[in-house]
């Protein structure tokens, strides 16, 4: 197994993002935490580390520029390349989780016992309306996957978190959730 490079070069986005995902994997694997969050960048981001990743990858503009050029041919292609980069990094993380046993005497994987929510870019709106999300893992917690769900505009995003918390027995409600 390769050694984790904790001094990942922030000028090499693939190395940097991979290191962050590997740290989360190790934290779950060693039961150092039960919760982790990682935001690479915001679509409104032009100046921070993650906002510059598309440029460093040779995709084009900073992240905020990609968001505003989605309706131009070259902009849509660049945004697609950025989304693909993010998705590939996420899949690598899921594969690590899938290939790690949940425990020494368990047939389940770490992915089976973990619920992961992933959101990707949302173009020019810079809001959480019509936001593409993936809910992965949690098979051992009773989640059923392999489906596409579309909700109305009045459905609070908090319903997703409420469902995740219900499946783990933490609580039935979360923020402005409406589902029970």
Where are these regions (language model features)?
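Ligand-binding pockets and gating/stacking loops
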Residues: 1-180
């Amino acid at each position: 197994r390769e050694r984790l490079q904790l001094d990942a070069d922030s000028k090499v986005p693939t190395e940097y993002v991979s290191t962050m995902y590997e740290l989360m994997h190790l934290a779950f694997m060693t039961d150092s935490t039960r919760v982790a969050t990682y935001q690479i960048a915001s679509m409104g981001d032009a100046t921070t580390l993650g906002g510059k990743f598309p440029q460093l990858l040779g995709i084009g503009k900073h992240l905020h520029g990609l968001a505003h050029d989605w309706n131009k041919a070259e902009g849509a292609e660049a945004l697609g390349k950025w989304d693909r980069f993010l998705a590939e990094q996420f899949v690598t993380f899921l594969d690590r989780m899938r290939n790690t046993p949940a425990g020494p005497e368990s047939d389940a994987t770490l992915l089976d016992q973990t619920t992961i929510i992933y959101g990707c870019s949302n173009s020019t709106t810079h809001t959480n309306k019509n936001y593409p999300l993936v809910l992965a893992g949690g098979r051992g917690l009773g989640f059923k996957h392999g489906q596409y769900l579309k909700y109305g505009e009045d459905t609070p995003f908090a319903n997703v978190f409420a469902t995740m918390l219900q499946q783990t027995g933490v609580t039935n409600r979360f923020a402005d959730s409406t589902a029970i």
